Amino acid sequence: MRYSIEKITTLIGARRIGEAEANVSWLLTDSRSLCFPEETLFFALRSGRNDGHNYIPELYRRGVRNFVVERGRFRLAADTQFERANFLEVVSPLEALQRLAERHRDEFDVPIVGITGSNGKTMVKEWLYQLLSPQKVVTRSPKSYNSQIGVPLSVWLLGEQTEVGLFEAGISQPGEMQALRDIIQPTIGVLTSLGGAHQENFRSMDEKCQEKLSLFHDAKVVAYNSDDNVVSRCMRKSGYRGEKLSWSKEDPQAAMFIKKIERRESISTLYYIYKGKEGTYHLPFIDDASVECSIAAAVVALYLGVTPEELDVRMSQLEPVAMRLEVKEGQHGCTIINDSYNSDINSLDIALDFMSRRPEQQGKSRTLILSDIYQSGMMPQELYHRVMELAVKRRVNKF
């Protein structure tokens, strides 16, 4: 989706310096990922080790004309070297990025799945994508984009064709989830598991669990493991009033009761009862982590309309998440970047960006081997034009 620079100025409450007409389709926080400069809005973020304002002259030379800067931090905005550029001054570029993503999210009335937990977020998200994408256009977080910066960049990917959104939310200390909740606004919540990650920043496991559950305050339904005593206790204390979509190996009253799990060689067979109806699915993994993540993905997929028969077929075909952006050394000094597990336009851009950033690839010929991209929601002519644009921008030599 495109937004005019005038509308963005209003949405983030900025003071605009510059009067150049512009439309924005891409948000950028890392100068190395620049692809479409003429439609890019750069947010000059500051951290303890870096300052995005230092990259503005370089990005301007590369064609970027729209920048969000910290008020009083960048004093060259009126300089003639930045002709026909727009500078949007705000108190905090990070908060402006989050606010813009929040306003963008407001435009969509589709199921949005928010996924949080100490472990398994990415696996549940990616497997849900595989379970849902054969029949729905799914927009999801790239890689593990679950931070205060990654979440708004992910939500910005929501487009007119999106039918379901899948977004991760990760926190490391109290108070961080509020901003992510406002951006994602999940209609469906998934709590994967609790673990010791970042526990040093919380007084207790209960406090960490409550912080994570706060993501789902306004969700219509929350999926969680009711066998986890901490999670069950925190759910009761939270006062959550929506539908509780629990899964359990112990409680037959759970929304999804796992009756039995059989493990043979490399396949697990799970026998379950979902809302009173029995079903079975076969999973091509036997480790505990994969089995647990499959249950979380299954209960949400069933809730979203995947039939038990479809679930079994798609579960049996699940690919390991580790296949994402697999790098292999080929013959004659070439490097192979395999992203065949993913097949959508955003993943293609990420893979090409990954290729262009690798130091050993500088100066080498770049070849793109691509199958068709299904479930994009685009007309073929629009899709192939978009692929061609990406290939040209990322300097692919052979296609």
Predicted regions and their residues:
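N-terminal leader/targeting and accessory segments in enzymes
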Residues: 1-99, 376, 389-390, 394, ...
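Phosphate-binding loop of NTP-binding sites
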Residues: 95-242
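Residue-level signal for inorganic ion chemistry
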Residues: 8, 40, 59, 100, ...
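Mobile, glycine- and charge-enriched loop segments
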Residues: 33-44, 138, 149, 153-165, ...
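Buried hydrophobic packing segments
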Residues: 97-100, 128, 132, 154-155, ...
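Generic hydrophobic/aromatic pocket-lining and core-packing "Φ" positions
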Residues: 56, 177, 212, 352, ...
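Acidic, Mg2+-coordinating active-site environments of NTP-dependent enzymes
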Residues: 75-77, 83, 190-335, 357, ...
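Active-site beta-alpha connecting loops in nucleotide-dependent enzymes
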Residues: 48-50, 321, 340-399
